[in-house]
Regions:
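Anion (oxyanion) recognition and catalysis
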Residues: 32, 64, 134, 179, ...
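Flexible glycine-/small-residue-enriched beta->alpha junction loops
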Residues: 1-5
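Metal-coordinating catalytic core of metallo-dependent amide/deamination hydrolases
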Residues: 6-25, 29, 37-150
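Active-site-adjacent C-terminal substructures of enzyme catalytic domains
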Residues: 139, 149-266, 278-282, 290, ...
Length: 306
């Protein structure tokens, strides 16, 4: 079911660090044209210590070179590499005893993420990996409840994870746990759309007091879309959120999902001054014109982007 990840792993391993940086830079420029000024980038397509560090170094270069701010997340626990098939305990040891310490030593990631899902890492394994990451200064995040509700969203709340992604089949106990733990539910409607899957119970989350964010989940295997204006439209159409709720989800709550709500996500004194000027009569129109690029101007850190 997850052969797509391993296919991308093969391609990523064969690419140089500079090739990865250049390709990602093109994607960032396209994101910027649609109004994205900050994004999170995850590793997880190397699945060896050297290859994961290579991806994180590429992300670091992007942060130095590109107008878009890029926040790095280590996700060595994205899949079980083919060379560890039948020996998952050994790979988890590699993650906890070698990869995470190396990432922390080089200070090239802010977060540690795990794919907690049937066939990938179970809740107990995910807890061990995320707790190890926290011990080394990496804030926990989790991919949870995309296909089966195996306890990932509950774990997110218990650990106080900054965010939990996907949550398509998030159960009531997961919603309650995230509300108690202050975890942001980062929903990925374009992935649901592309895969023909269900959509997360966004309204139940909002009513329970869970902060809801939305992101593109741009990746080679399950979501080739990086247009956040398409994501905005899906938020209204599929989650039945109001335009105001969707705006909050892709701005302030999105910033909270990467620990930056004190710097970006709203126009306030003391923040960085990132904003988008729209060619639209009102907010409803942006949601209505799903997928269209209505960006008129992008301002990054108080300066107009050419």
């Amino acid at each position: 079911a997850f052969g797509g990840i391993l296919s991308t792993v093969k391609s990523t391993r064969s690419a140089s660090e500079e090739e990865l940086t250049e390709k990602a830079s093109l994607a960032l420029s396209e994101m910027l044209s649609f109004g994205t000024t900050t994004c999170e980038a995850k590793s997880g397509y190397g699945l060896t210590t050297d290859e994961e560090l290579k991806q994180l170094r590429a992300i670091q270069k992007l942060q130095e070179r590109h107008a878009v701010d890029v926040v790095a997340t280590f996700m060595g626990a994205h899949a079980l590499p083919s060379e560890y098939k039948g020996n998952r305990d050994a790979y988890i040891r590699l993650l906890c005893e070698e990869m995470i310490p190396a990432v922390a030593e080089q200070k090239i990631a802010k977060f540690c993420d795990v794919f907690c899902e049937t066939g990938v890492f179970n809740a107990q394994e995910s807890r061990k990996i995320l707790e190890t990451g926290r011990k080394y200064g990496l804030t926990p995040k989790i991919h949870a409840d995309e296909i089966d509700p195996i306890g990932g969203s509950v774990l997110a709340g218990e650990l106080g994870a900054v965010s939990a992604e996907h949550l398509i089949v998030c159960p009531p106990e997961g919603i309650s746990s995230m509300a108690k733990g202050g975890t942001v539910a980062c929903l990925l409607p374009a992935t649901s759309f592309y895969l023909g899957a269900g959509f997360a119970p966004a309204r139940s989350m909002v009513e329970a007091g869970v902060p809801v964010a939305m992101a593109s989940d741009f990746n080679p295997g399950s979501c080739p879309c990086l247009n956040m204006q398409f994501v905005i439209g899906l938020g209204c159409l599929k989650y039945k959120l109001t335009p105001e709720e969707v705006l909050t989800a892709v701005t302030l709550n999105g910033a909270a999902a990467i620990g930056m709500a004190d710097q970006i996500g709203s126009v306030e004194v003391g923040k960085l001054g990132d904003l988008v000027v729209w060619d639209a009569p009102d907010l409803d129109y942006i949601c209505y014109r799903i997928g269209s690029n209505l960006v008129k101007k992008v301002i990054k850190r108080g300066r107009m982007v050419p």
